Amino acid sequence: MSAVTRCEDGLVLRLYIQPKASRDSIVGLHGDEVKVAITAPPVDGQANSHLIKFLGKQFRVAKSQIVIEKGELGRHKQVKIIHPQQIPPEITALTE
């Protein structure tokens, strides 16, 4: 499975999360996953909620349209984004 997969109602992303980074960013490919750096620490779900907020801004969707399908407690996650309004250039490059 590739890092970015299109489905009938949006995108499915396979992510590798780097918590406690200096800034929030989509770094690029990390093996067969997209590496995302976020500033939040991996404590009490802070990193997950911060990741959802960051992805919501990047894809211009409500937080309720982002679902962590797999990897709630780990760095390797599978996230579904329902009906993205915008796709960041880093992700567009991976879908082509």
From Swiss-Prot:
One of its GO terms (cellular component) is cytoplasm. Gene3D superfamilies: YggU-like. It holds the Pfam family DUF167. SUPFAM superfamilies: YggU-like. It comes from the Bacteria. HAMAP family: UPF0235. Belongs to the UPF0235 family. This is UPF0235 protein YggU. It comes from Salmonella heidelberg (strain SL476). The lineage of its organism: Bacteria, Pseudomonadati, Pseudomonadota, Gammaproteobacteria, Enterobacterales.
